[in-house]
Amino acid sequence: MCGGQRPLFLLPLLAVCLGAKGRNQEERLLGDLMQGYNPHLRPAEHDSDVVNVSLKLTLTNLISLNEREEALTTNVWIEMQWCDYRLRWDPRDYGGLWVLRVPSTMVWRPDIVLENNVDGVFEVALYCNVLVSPDGCVYWLPPAIFRSSCPVSVTFFPFDWQNCSLIFQSQTYSTNEINLQLSQEDGQTIEWIFIDPEAFTENGEWAIRHRPAKMLLDEAAPAEEAGHQKVVFYLLIQRKPLFYVINIIAPCVLISSVAILIYFLPAKAGGQKCTVAINVLLAQTVFLFLVAKKVPETSQAVPLISKYLTFLLVVTILIVVNAVVVLNVSLRSPHTHSMARGVRKVFLRLLPQLLRMHVRPLAPVAVQDAHPRLQNGSSSGWPITAGEEVALCLPRSELLFRQRQRNGLVRAALEKLEKGPESGQSPEWCGSLKQAAPAIQACVEACNLIARARHQQTHFDSGNKEWFLVGRVLDRVCFLAMLSLFVCGTAGIFLMAHYNRVPALPFPGDPRSYLPSSD
């Protein structure tokens, strides 16, 4: 029984020995490869040899785009491949070892950096191990968080799209020493930024529309000298404007609509109109400051939303001016201003008909007040006679004789009384009339004074009503003008964003889409 259990005790020992043998093979291979190896020398067997370096960029997260600093922050993986003849081995000599993991600081690496960084960080975030195959090819996949410069065009903000790029090049090697190229898979060149759907995190503000990649040669290098190659990865991103529509544009439109509604207040309520309009003006100024903190401080272009807010400010200021002008016109009187015939014709006849406003023609106050009584009968309910109609329609001073004849008749009567009684008149009657003549003349003069005051008051009231009606018509004209300006301006400004679309192809004139066939 004991003899049968010995093989079972030997199995763990055998496994440990085999593992130690495997580790020894990897350690021996690493020692052999690193013997006499200089990581600072370019892996070229001859001076004229060019080392091919393949690049591939995998995007895992588009973190943010800071418009004020014009900086794009991305989380990427940089895949680099090259061949080093000093790292070759025969797998049969090392127990069938096909992959060797080596610290990246122990081998030569191409000094490829992000040229257009904005924070001074040119290198990757983590120097992870490299994978070396028996033929000497090295595979390196370091992660990095880059902050690259991205010129921001704010012309159509927040309905804009931006063209950002990540430019990689060798810091010291020229094209005669290193040949940068895009990686290939299945015989196809990867001319795009690779995105793994399972590892990629969608950005809440930006949507990626195009992600091509291109090889460029430094045009600034002299013709007799070797230039530097650049691998440029482009990101054409479009902003998702829902946040700005809900938090800025919609409140501005609603607040400006309140400024339009002040025209429904009476024409004489100019103080209340100005108060509402100025409050709207202050609210729009706050929104303008919020937008100014978001966009970059540049004078090359004015953001679309800033144009709209400025337009709303102008409309609101015009509304305040209209309210002041209408109030000034409505409070005019015949004592301060005389109405021209053209003004009366345009604002009291033509415009009310065009605007379908019910403006009743003005009539004298006494006659206008008497019409209801003529229609409804006397206060006692009896029918009105012709004499009562005259008494109701005319002033009391006109019942005796007309205004222009009154003074002449009184003067003629006094002259006859002074000459003496005529035939058929008794001296007593003439004497009593002569004694009462001064009182009658005083009564007539009092009636004349009352008639003149009544006429002046009627003229004054009629003039006030005319100016008030002119103010009403002017207020209605300003309302229609401001409403048309507000609607047309809002539609015109935001229709400009409709034509600002991301191009269907990343490069004008190039029919290629720079995307894998599956996309």
Swiss-Prot record:
Residues 23-240 are extracellular. SUPFAM superfamilies: Neurotransmitter-gated ion-channel transmembrane pore, Nicotinic receptor ligand binding domain-like. Disulfide bonds join 150-164. Its main location: membrane. Residues 330-476 are cytoplasmic. One of its GO terms (biological process) is membrane depolarization. The chain crosses the membrane at residues 241-265, 274-292, 308-329, 477-497. It is a multi-pass membrane protein. GO terms for molecular function: acetylcholine receptor activity; acetylcholine-gated monoatomic cation-selective channel activity; transmitter-gated monoatomic ion channel activity involved in regulation of postsynaptic membrane potential. InterPro entries: Neur_chan_lig-bd, Neur_chan_lig-bd_sf, Neur_channel, Neuro-gated_channel_TM_sf, Neuro_actylchol_rec, Neurotrans-gated_channel_TM, Neurotransmitter_ion_chnl_CS, Nicotinic_acetylcholine_rcpt. The keyword NADP does not apply. PANTHER family: NEUROTRANSMITTER GATED ION CHANNEL (PTHR18945). This is Acetylcholine receptor subunit gamma. It comes from Bos taurus (Bovine).
